């Protein structure tokens, strides 16, 4: 049985860094992916699926949802780790629904929790615009990314809240505090459901 944790949060919430630190520390047990990594990995493998993904990316198009879902499913099922953390997913109501369907069709994957790293828009803006992460980190791009994140957020929160899967973590603290909080939650969940 694969145990899946999803981490969502605004741009600049630190969700990727948090997940990376936890997965490194427990590398015998936990694998961490971001959706972008998974797609790039598939392209690198040179599989037919990878070739399809590359054709969309090369043309600057969004990779269709069913292809993203196939990629995620393959990564989870083929991972040699029991626990999988995926950050930055789901980003939309469509992705959330597609994931739910995929989980129903694959009883060997169990969604343990959706962890939301909560930060204010001010904090997120400060972190993103204050860090040199590449050309797209300017104000307009940040505002667009923030808007894309916030638009479906209530529906996503509600959906997982109803299932008793949503865990909010305060992202305004130091990285050490956030990681400690997230790590103990994940390990406790794994133990509970061992």
Swiss-Prot record:
One BP term from GO: AMP salvage
Membrane spanning stretches: none
InterPro entries the UniProt entry points to: Adenylat/UMP-CMP_kin, Adenylat_kinase_CS, P-loop_NTPase
Protein keywords: ATP-binding, Cytoplasm, Kinase, Nucleotide biosynthesis, Nucleotide-binding, Transferase
GO cellular component: a single term: cytoplasm
Annotated function: Catalyzes the reversible transfer of the terminal phosphate group between ATP and AMP. Plays an important role in cellular energy homeostasis and in adenine nucleotide metabolism.
Alphabetized PANTHER family for the sequence: NUCLEOTIDE KINASE
Name of the featured protein: Adenylate kinase
